[in-house]
């Protein structure tokens, strides 16, 4: 069996040490000692307390709010430190890829920051990237190094079968057209029906019905405003059930990311209005901003389930049973083992394959 390094060295920063410890435990190894802190100047300091020369290094870091930028910087510095310490191969394991929603130029002068992050990882010295449930699979094309995009689908299937009463008569729902492929894949695996919700932005519809006008000359005060950000008060979203009959059904919403919870709230409301008996929301990455946490108990769902790609310990405790997590440590550990041994990663996600 081919091995690219003498042994697996698993490092982690401050983003999600609990997940790294769980992955290390499943691999039967100890985390490589690494101290990540800040100088008084707030610059990031990284000290690796064990040799990584000629080793197969995996750095697990999942940048998450409120310290996304600090976590990303930690990851880049750790990669660079291992590179200059003569590691044989460096794999960045990033369960929740940062800036993934900035993946296209959707307005004038908008940066494609997901591409910038890809460039930074490669320049820092990463030879390989492992991530999970990318917001857009095309992000893999931003890299000139190998990228493995893992899927939480098997873990979600297991949760549905074990925790959702009457799941065989449930229906899988995508809250928008963009997530239809993800939701239909899960529905096919479970042999369940599929429903799709259509989302419309009222301001966009109004704008499409008017002729373009010459914009006014900007004033000094306008230069200092958040001109590039949408004014939420000016955008009214409307959702309507486009495909599928949910009356009397247990509905399982599937999406890749929850931040403000706005999409989940609107979609669950539509399903309730159309006669759904219960609504579960299964989301790959729970960013869960402070605003979301304040309103989480009012979400019209029975359960909000997210993976532990981001540490949810405090949020779970604060939600009184509404929020649950799915453990992705097994699939990450197995992907690391297979990468180290030169085995197929795609085999992990074939039907009847186990890990």
Enumerate the predicted regions with their spans.
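PRPP-associated nucleotide enzymes
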Residues: 1-355
